[in-house]
């Protein structure tokens, strides 16, 4: 008994065969039912283990995400702290460099003042030495002239009188 339901598409005939024995539908349903019955535990166990593994992987991934997020936050915080520390060190270095430069300038000015003072002292000492040398030379010249002129001006009586006065002044 062949029952067909014609279904026409684009001038071609198409028919469905509803004969259960001819289409082997009972055998197919029976095989599928037996497979489901016998393999349900096996496939169910495999699927359950697979589901648990996937859930464990998801949980592990979530934990790693949380850990990575915390590590990222900590890293960002440490980076910000490192930047702050670096800026602080840079500011301190600039301040120290300015202080060193100012100290160097101050020392240079002090050294220049000391050198100038030493030069002035040397100049004054040299001027005093030259003045003293000129005085000594002038005195020597005056004494030489006086000694040269003295014998012409002094006679024996004046010489004796000069010697006596000198002795009285000493004595």
Swiss-Prot record:
The keyword Transmembrane helix applies. Disulfide bonds: none annotated. Keywords: ATP synthesis, CF(0), Hydrogen ion transport, Ion transport, Membrane, Thylakoid, Transmembrane, Transmembrane helix, Transport. InterPro entries: ATP_synth_B-like_membr_sf (IPR028987), ATP_synth_b/b'su_bac/chlpt (IPR002146), ATP_synth_F0_bsu_bac (IPR005864). GO terms for molecular function: proton-transporting ATP synthase activity, rotational mechanism. It is found in: Cellular thylakoid membrane. Its main location: membrane. GO terms for cellular component: plasma membrane-derived thylakoid membrane; proton-transporting ATP synthase complex. The chain crosses the membrane at residues 26-46. SUPFAM superfamilies: F1F0 ATP synthase subunit B, membrane domain. It is a single-pass membrane protein. It comes from the Bacteria. Pfam families: ATP-synt_B. Belongs to the ATPase B chain family. F(1)F(0) ATP synthase produces ATP from ADP in the presence of a proton or sodium gradient. F-type ATPases consist of two structural domains, F(1) containing the extramembraneous catalytic core and F(0) containing the membrane proton channel, linked together by a central stalk and a peripheral stalk. During catalysis, ATP synthesis in the catalytic domain of F(1) is coupled via a rotary mechanism of the central stalk subunits to proton translocation. F-type ATPases have 2 components, F(1) - the catalytic core - and F(0) - the membrane proton channel. F(1) has five subunits: alpha(3), beta(3), gamma(1), delta(1), epsilon(1). F(0) has four main subunits: a(1), b(1), b'(1) and c(10-14). The alpha and beta chains form an alternating ring which encloses part of the gamma chain. F(1) is attached to F(0) by a central stalk formed by the gamma and epsilon chains, while a peripheral stalk is formed by the delta, b and b' chains. PANTHER family: ATP SYNTHASE SUBUNIT B, CHLOROPLASTIC. This is ATP synthase subunit b. The gene is atpF.
